Amino acid sequence: MASARVRVGREVAGRGGKGVSVISGLPLAGPDLEALASRLKRLCGAGGAVRDGTIEIQGEHRDRLVAELRLLGYDAKRSGG
């Protein structure tokens, strides 16, 4: 795959205190981004969405997401606290 710098962070703002894991920097668009989002949601057993070129997965799943993205060949790093 690509060696793009992919960041996996956590956001709470605007979500009533419920956090989401946010994946940004993916070199994908359209159906490819949707397909990856679907795979990652299934892996985490959680809902989520694709918004403005980022993938949001409900809940705290950063470590699991970083591990899976690295297996897929992305240079994924955990960002934030």
Model-derived features: positions:
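A generic structural motif
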Residues: 53-58
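Long, charged, low-complexity intrinsically disordered regions
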Residues: 1-42, 49-51, 63-81
